[in-house]
Amino acid sequence: MLLRPLNFLSLLVALGLLLPGCAHPHTAPATAQQTLGGMVVALNSNSPHTGDNTITITVTDANTKSPVGNANITATAEMISPRLPGTQVSGRAQGNGLYSIPVRFGVATRYHLTLHIQRPGQSSVTVVFPIDAAE
């Protein structure tokens, strides 16, 4: 009869050691940069988490390095697994090539943030950034 309590105790100890490793770690700020369509698009998501977030995008001209302040930016955050489409939101120009985008992450998981950037007189550009949202 002593064997069953020992097996149960061993199971509890094993779970106590394994479960903390399954938790989502605190996510550091996500920063990334891509050059596409004559623009450099830099993302800073400042510790993405479940709930409301503000993503900051900086857009500069790839050739002149000057800020692009006249772009129209829309964004969609799509959950990867399970694949769920997100709601499209618009970026707000803050001046000097800086745009803020309100994004809501429903759960702690990986998302693809798809940005559509349109400058007057230019072809539209689509950029995708992976973002890991924490709890």
Locate predicted features.
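Aromatic sugar-binding surface patches on proteins
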Residues: Q94-S100
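C-terminal motif of bacterial Sec signal peptides marking the signal peptidase cleavage site
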Residues: L18-G21
